[in-house]
């Protein structure tokens, strides 16, 4: 019995070692610096994607995902080095000073003509942008509460199906030409709330809309065409296959969902509207 147990343990260790070796082997000779993984982020990088503008801490959604991907590719935390780029600079075609870049890059056909994207590591939820004054009146993250709010939206937004089919407000939403008009209407008290993808809503509530607040977020599957974020790489990057394998494993194991829950639900305090 002891021999069987020891044999099983040895086989398990061998399988684990082989898996780690496979991960490491995938990236051999494919990174900018042999044995190192160079990851880019913004300058500065913002909450909740990177906490305190310190990606090396591994804190914040994208910082945590970056280290999880690195680990699956066979790189320890000590083997990861960070560089900074502007958002627009990295999208341009040409040679890159990083192996991959994480700055909430939405995967689009237009961008894929110039650079490579990984599989999605995040599918954006739709969030309810409002103001603290609306929250103070008793608005809650429930469909019953949302139905009674005055809504605004851009006429061409992909959020309209959620408004009409899911929220079903008691009064028709007011339609505007662009997001700037919607934001102005919120601040003027003409409307109570609007729907944006979660990253945009976080930014607007913190920087643009005076007294802005987030009431809640809908699961991504309730959006018709949700934004999906991918790792940005140089066109034709030999690392793409390795990165995609790592993301697939993190997705299938539930690790990616756990990181998202920690940094984009718990850390931001934006409740999910069921």
Residue ranges and their predicted role:
Residues 24-104:
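Extracytoplasmic small-molecule ligand-binding "clamshell" domains
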Residues 39, 44-45, 56-72, 106, ...:
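Bilobed "Venus flytrap"/periplasmic-binding protein-like clamshell domains
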Residues 63-72, 134, 148-150, 157, ...:
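Extended ligand-binding regions for polar small-molecule ligands
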Residues 75-77, 95-103, 149, 187-196, ...:
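Alpha-to-beta junction loops
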């Amino acid at each position: 019995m002891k021999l069987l147990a020891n044999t099983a343990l040895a086989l398990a260790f061998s399988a684990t070692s082989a898996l780690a070796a496979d991960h490491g082997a995938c990236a051999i000779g494919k990174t900018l610096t042999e044995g190192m993984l160079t990851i880019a982020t913004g300058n500065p990088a913002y909450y909740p994607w990177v906490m305190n503008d310190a990606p090396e801490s591994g804190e914040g959604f994208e910082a945590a995902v970056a280290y999880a991907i690195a680990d699956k590719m066979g790189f320890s935390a000590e083997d990861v080095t960070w560089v900074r780029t502007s958002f627009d600079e990295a999208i341009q075609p040409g040679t890159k000073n990083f192996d991959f870049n994480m700055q909430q890059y939405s995967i689009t056909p237009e961008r894929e003509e110039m650079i490579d994207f990984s599989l999605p590591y995040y599918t954006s939820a739709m969030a309810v942008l409002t103001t603290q004054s609306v929250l103070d009146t008793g608005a809650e993250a429930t469909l019953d509460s949302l139905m009674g709010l005055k809504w605004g939206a851009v006429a061409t937004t992909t959020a309209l199906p959620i408004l009409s089919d899911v929220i079903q407000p008691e009064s028709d939403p007011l339609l505007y030409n662009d997001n700037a008009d919607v934001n102005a209407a919120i601040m003027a008290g003409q409307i109570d709330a609007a729907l944006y993808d979660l990253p945009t809503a976080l930014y607007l509530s913190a920087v643009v809309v005076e007294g802005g607040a987030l009431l809640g977020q809908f699961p991504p599957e309730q959006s018709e065409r949700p934004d999906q974020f991918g790792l940005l790489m140089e066109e034709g990057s030999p690392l793409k296959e390795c990165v995609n394998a790592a993301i697939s494993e993190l997705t299938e194991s539930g690790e990616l969902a756990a990181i998202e829950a920690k940094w984009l639900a718990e850390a931001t305090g934006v409740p999910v509207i069921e």
